[in-house]
Amino acid sequence: MIHNVEKTKLEYGDFQTPLELAEKVCEKLVQLGVNPDIIVEPTCGLGNFIEAASYSFTRAKKIFGIEINSNYLDKIKEKQIFLNDEKFDIRCGDFFQVDWSSIIGQLNKEILIIGNLPWVTNSQQGSIDGENLPIKNNFQNYHGLDAITGKSNFDISEWMLIRLVQCLQKHNGYLAMLCKTSVSRKILNYIHSQKLNLAYSATYKIDTRKYFRVNVDACLFLCKFDLISKNYFCDIFDNIETSKYYRIGYHNNVLIKDLVALKRLKNLYTNKSNIKWRSGIKHDCASVMELQKINDTFINGLGEIVDIEETYLFPLIKGSYVAQNKINATDRYILVTQKIIGEPTDNIRDLAPKTWQYLEKHEKLLDTRKSKIYQNKPRFSIFGVGSYSFSPWKIAICGLYKKLEFRLIGKISEKPTIFDDTVYFLSFEDEEIAFKTVALLNSSLARDFYSSLVFWDEKRPIKSSILNSLDLEVLAKVIL
């Protein structure tokens, strides 16, 4: 059981900003010409940001600090700086209950919203039965499978930042927040998708190990707002001190990591690819569906010896194997119960009775899989399967690893190789075509192209949408 204090810190994504870092952030903002009349910190914690801001922004007439943790508020009120200065307005409040429009909307002067919002996702909240969440709604507007297979998991700070951006749309002001770098891009995506006002934005990488003792890719995210500008790009700085940067922005409504590099290679870009990268099989029950072969004996993830027909068993190459080039042999196998999504599975009972008995033995695990993709589907269904899964030749890459290395993979033991759902692949019937294609994909030109698109700090940096954006026909004409 998580101790109550620890649970509270986890629930609120509680990473208190050291005064040293708060001062550096404020100094940077001053260098950039930020000089607000009003300062707001929505989750002020121990008050380090509002303290640093009071020293740096001497013109500020009012500094608001809102905090849900009453223990922190008690400590703030003990600090001498906050005792006798009427410009400070420190309140107890829950971000998700505060009417930010009424607070910010009343202010007709230049505003700075500054701080450090919680670094926690809604799924992490669920794992500890946390309640520090906004009212549930699909604010990212994900559709279909994206909404039900986990893409709708989001950082709490993402929702909070969107709310603050909305409040600043009718103001001249700034937003300066510490957040995960991936969250800053999601906010830029939101602003772009909604065609909101944005005069300028930038991120400055921060040393989270030094300041927070965690290994998280995070940044100072700065946005400048006015009443007319719609500048949907973001300058990326390696740290707060440097003046060197590169610019991310949009091409064909897709966020691009390096606009300059893509401009040089834009003839290779397509949003109507003739080929389609697929992901491997998803089953959400590895302990039953994946087996290890040891001395001609199959063992499942529960440690059980499994005696079944090999009719529905196929060699499995996991994403880590693809990344490490362990592709010519495997001791892992996967039960593939369907050839296409939604195919009836009853025929397994007749074609492979021992396999059916095995599945029924573990029906409780299989029937209680949480994902909605299995609802109202045949028993023991899988996902991410089709005729492409059984092609003899495949070109594969793991979406989780931070390297662009494509592997050509053939059959193993006369059976087509199957991948897990961390792998993306192209399928081929013809070995020669597959061989030529993998050579194209591993060319320096292809790597330069993909490198201009991939954000390596993301959990799954390589995505099918990125892979599909390379026009292989054009690339072949350039190289061959």
Curated annotation (Swiss-Prot):
The keyword S-adenosyl-L-methionine applies. Its EC number is 2.1.1.-. It comes from the Bacteria. One of its GO terms (biological process) is DNA restriction-modification system. The keyword Acyltransferase does not apply. Keywords: DNA-binding, Methyltransferase, Restriction system, S-adenosyl-L-methionine, Transferase. One of its GO terms (molecular function) is DNA binding. InterPro entries: N4_N6_ade-DNA_methylase (IPR050953), SAM-dependent_MTases_sf (IPR029063). A gamma subtype methylase that recognizes the double-stranded sequence 5'-TTCGAA-3', and methylates it on an unknown base to protect it against the NspV endonuclease. Belongs to the methyltransferase superfamily. This is Type II methyltransferase M.NspV. It comes from Nostoc sp. (strain ATCC 29411 / PCC 7524). The gene is nspVM.
